Amino acid sequence: MLVLGIESSCDETGLALYDTQRGLLAHALHSQIAMHREYGGVVPELASRDHIRRALPLLEEVMAQSGTHRDDIDAIAFTQGPGLAGALLVGASIANALALAWNKPTVGIHHLEGHLLSPLLVDEPPPFPFIALLVSGGHTQLMRVTDVGVYETLGETLDDAAGEAFDKTAKLIGLGYPGGPEVSKLAETGTPGAVVLPRPMLHSGDLDFSFSGLKTAVLTQMKKFEAAKLESEALERAKADLARGFVDAAVDVLVAKSLAALKQTKLKRLVVAGGVGANRQLRAALSAAAAKRGFDVHYPDLALCTDNGAMIALAGALRLGRWPEQANADYAFTVKPRWDLASLAR
């Protein structure tokens, strides 16, 4: 089965072709970072308009890369939610318009299911069951994954997502957009232990997260720096130490909760997905813990940590392979800006 995947939930337009026999044939991605940078964050209306501009050229690109003709495609998968309503509508409209013109069925995909399954795109994919740590700008969750479509939420953030905390911390420190990669890069130059920040809910006894207090601690520390009237060079060193303190605290919590989930479920496989899954400090800490504790940890390729069409095409192929009745051939569709992954129907 050959599936075209279309991702447009936020500020990346992604298209890809996935074949159940040959694997990922082609994928193309356009990021809107440069467009949104001057606003310091994603502007939904601009995001929607840019998806309209980019989708068809990206389609031509993946078709040319793979030597695929439209007649070769068996189905079209699109991100149905969660995400920005306007952005989702663009992708859904394009998917269903193509499907109508080409006489193909469609299937709507949960954005987080795409992330959760993206590590299956590697050469040696992890077998089910496993624990999934989903960490992105909008979500932080621990899931027990028994099979495709069989997901149980074990813990989630009670306020800010981890990626949101990274972005907001970067803004407080005075770094550029997008903040996550910038604060991580600065943290690598900071001194370990120079600034120690709280580890929220580290000993809460459950698998939930909270990052708003950590963000507040960064704000408090920045106010102290301002009150001290540090010279320029000293201030930059202090900011680097603060960034290191923030990243260390966030990573400690993510690792500790992941280990607790593995212990609670007695599983030996951890899958890490979402944009924050590209963070080098997090990967290093989890890999070290895996070596020490005797479990396996799996990541998607770095290029597939961000939003992308490949994960949507894969999820579509897996769903249609198991449940052909989920194929939609009447081209009526809705989008779901809010959508709980645990409620996803098989």
From Swiss-Prot:
Pfam families with a match to the protein in the record: TsaD
Residue sites binding substrate per the record: L134, V135, S136, G137, G138, D167, G180, N279
InterPro entries: ATPase_NBD, Gcp-like_dom, KAE1/TsaD, TsaD
Subcellular location, principal: cytoplasm
Gene3D superfamilies, per database record: 3.30.420.40
GO MF, one annotated term: iron ion binding
Domain of life, per lineage: Bacteria
One term under GO cellular component: cytoplasm
GO biological process, one term: tRNA threonylcarbamoyladenosine modification
Co-factor binding details: Binds 1 Fe(2+) ion per subunit.
Subcellular location: Cytoplasm
Cofactor needs: Fe(2+)
Catalysed transformations (reactions): L-threonylcarbamoyladenylate + adenosine(37) in tRNA = N(6)-L-threonylcarbamoyladenosine(37) in tRNA + AMP + H(+)
EC number: 2.3.1.234
Record's keyword terms, sorted: Acyltransferase, Cytoplasm, Iron, Metal-binding, Transferase, tRNA processing
Chain sites annotated for binding Fe cation: H111, H115, D307
Stated family: Belongs to the KAE1 / TsaD family.
Function of the molecule: Required for the formation of a threonylcarbamoyl group on adenosine at position 37 (t(6)A37) in tRNAs that read codons beginning with adenine. Is involved in the transfer of the threonylcarbamoyl moiety of threonylcarbamoyl-AMP (TC-AMP) to the N6 group of A37, together with TsaE and TsaB. TsaD likely plays a direct catalytic role in this reaction.
Alphabetized HAMAP family for the sequence: TsaD
Protein name per UniProt: tRNA N6-adenosine threonylcarbamoyltransferase
Species, as recorded: Burkholderia ambifaria (strain MC40-6)
Gene name of the record: tsaD
